[in-house]
């Protein structure tokens, strides 16, 4: 005899064969996703962790190639051809683009929050310590901000349960938006009677707004923000308080003031309603004090406090005045951004 032999009554659970990563790794229809999971992106390490639960949205090679993504083995590089204009991107830029999309297809779901997609909801993608972007679902269709721009969705065409979560097979990508959040705000304000109309009307006439591309000064593509938009009644309230230009008696706004001092009031008001570098929602994931785009008279940062819990989202200004989100008209997706409608305005005082 040269050793001992022990029998077991349970197979050792390997991360590679019992996790949502397995759904891609063991199926030749998903070689492109598997390649980027394994190329040092850290995605494999995330989704193969059987001690945490995830939901994975998995596009096949056919889906990826149909939307312009492929890997050139002869050149050892990723390649992307835009389905819209045929523009070709290769190398690290193409890889980064696909990596962003596939990271938004990974969602930390410790309580199985996405096991039933027949209803509707919004959730943050990525793992808990490295947030992705917010995505939505409705009646077994999943959307990113880019899908809303393109007018499509990723449909669920099947699923597979693993030890650490569920894999959904999808017929489209969960796309990110390449438009300025100003475009999304403009679209929200467009319908007759829109509650975003008053705020947007001040914005589009302000020094912060560039009609070419609907760009907002200080708001850069690819950076996280939260837009806190007072509804029409809150804007009227701000006018009556002299916080915004208009008739202080009737509350009728003057969206395009001629005096420089009033123009500055508008610009500062708008900046204070945009949280910089953070995206917050009514999910309890982020709370505390967050920087806004506004600077004080000394050029220092200003802050707004955020209270967040399941179904709760409140913004509090320096004077301790609060603005509560309006659930039916909040959590609108934009580029790494959420746009919320609130029932009050925020005011910075020095």
What are these regions (language model features)?
Residues 1-350:
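Mature, structured domains of secreted/extracytosolic soluble proteins
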């Amino acid at each position: 005899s040269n050793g001992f032999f022990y029998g077991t009554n349970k197979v050792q659970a390997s991360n590679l064969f019992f996790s949502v990563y397995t759904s891609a790794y063991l199926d030749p229809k998903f070689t492109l996703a598997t390649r980027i999971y394994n190329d040092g992106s850290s995605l494999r390490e995330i989704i193969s962790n059987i001690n945490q639960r995830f939901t994975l949205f998995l596009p096949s090679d056919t889906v990826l190639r149909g939307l312009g993504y492929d890997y050139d083995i002869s050149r050892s590089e990723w390649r992307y051809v835009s389905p819209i204009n045929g523009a070709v991107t290769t190398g690290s830029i193409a890889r980064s683009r696909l990596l962003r999309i596939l990271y938004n297809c990974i969602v930390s779901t410790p309580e199985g929050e996405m096991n039933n997609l027949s209803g509707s909801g919004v959730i943050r993608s990525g793992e808990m310590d490295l947030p992705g972007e917010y995505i939505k679902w409705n009646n077994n269709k999943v959307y990113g901000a880019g899908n809303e721009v393109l007018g499509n969705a990723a449909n669920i065409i099947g699923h597979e349960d693993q030890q650490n979560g569920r894999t959904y097979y999808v017929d489209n990508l969960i796309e990110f938006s390449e438009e300025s959040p100003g475009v999304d705000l403009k679209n929200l304000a467009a319908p007759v009677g829109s509650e975003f109309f008053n705020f947007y009307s001040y914005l589009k006439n302000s020094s912060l707004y560039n009609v070419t591309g609907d760009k907002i000064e200080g708001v850069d593509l690819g950076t996280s923000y939260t837009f806190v938009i007072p509804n029409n009644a809150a804007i009227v309230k701000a006018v009556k308080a002299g916080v915004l230009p208009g008739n202080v008696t009737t509350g009728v706004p003057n969206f395009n003031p001629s005096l420089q001092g009033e123009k500055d009031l508008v610009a500062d008001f708008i900046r204070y309603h945009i949280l910089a570098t953070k995206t917050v929602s009514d999910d309890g994931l982020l709370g505390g004090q967050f920087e806004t785009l506004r600077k004080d008279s000394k050029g220092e940062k200003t802050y707004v406090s955020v209270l967040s819990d399941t179904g709760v989202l409140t913004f509090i200004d320096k004077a301790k005045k609060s603005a509560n989100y309006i659930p039916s008209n909040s959590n609108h997706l934009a580029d790494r951004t959420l746009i919320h409608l609130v029932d009050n305005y925020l005011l910075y005082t020095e």
